[in-house]
Amino acid sequence: VLDSSSSNQKPLNIGFTLGDPAGIGPEIFFKFQQNFQNNPNFNILLIDDLKAYNQVLSKIKLGQPSGFCGEHCYHSLKKADFLFRQNQIDYLVTGPVSKESLWMAGLNFSGQTELLASINQLNSDDIEMFFVLDDFRVVLATRHISINQVSDNLKKRLPRVLDNATNAMQSIFKIPKPKIAVAGLNPHAGENGIIGKEETEFMSRMLNHFSTKQIADVNGPFSADALFARAAQNYLNNRIQEYDLFVAAYHDQILPLIKGLGGFRAVNLTAGLPYLRLSVDHGTGFDIAGQNIASCEGLLACTQLILKISHREKAKFA
């Protein structure tokens, strides 16, 4: 741990994984470490075993997925889980990992979110993937699946997503009764069944049923283009969002907008694990690996969100 304990308040211990050794994860971590290792608000704990990391580097080519990389990432996540249970870290920030590397290592998971659920012996449906850009917060109703599986998966998951997301908004963001907007699946939210029937056949019914719990103010399903265009305008004009949380029906319904608006400032947050895990909102950057041009802004955004969640939002970065 690189101690930066000059603050009167005990610094947070934040654990970092490098991500895929063949990508930009190691580069952005060491840049972040160099710039912020003396910050009094947090200690930086590198979870990866550097000896093992260097051994992996000798077996791979930068910019290419490899089973060696996938295996290294798995062991880093296992070690992170162990360190949390030993009370050695307070938060986890993960570097980007190639899903192909995981699969080449025999780890048939669609991403680190699902892998962390497995490590914690949780059903992946019990954890949720949030994306946070200031007060523009989004949760994905379906995650890393093909588009032809979205409708069935949405029908299965939507009620649980609403429950899990509401719990996360209450416990993490301290919003007692969040105002939630749900995007429809089809263009124009199906136009009352003319374009698609998911909204009329099950989405509206599920939202109405969830509303009876009176634990959140749930609205929708709305036409996604109008809903997210308004959210984008609010963000660009520094206006407070009308909703505390937006629910996107599928991955690419919202991620292009979040990444376009926020660049590296958007943060991927996993809710439902025994600890809070955050990650940069970008991939492994295989195309620029080893060129020393990658930005560590995503790791800075993760750390800023941790400070905000832990009620240290006024903390300054050295």
Q: What are these model-predicted stretches?
A:
Residues F130-R160:
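Ligand-binding beta-strand-loop-alpha-helix segment within the catalytic cores
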Residues V1-L115, K155-V267, L273-A318:
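Contiguous, glycine/small-aliphatic-enriched amphipathic segments in soluble metabolic enzymes
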Residues I44, T113, I127-E128, F136-V139:
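Small-molecule pocket liners
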Residues I119-F136, A271-D287:
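Short, flexible loop segments at boundaries between secondary-structure elements
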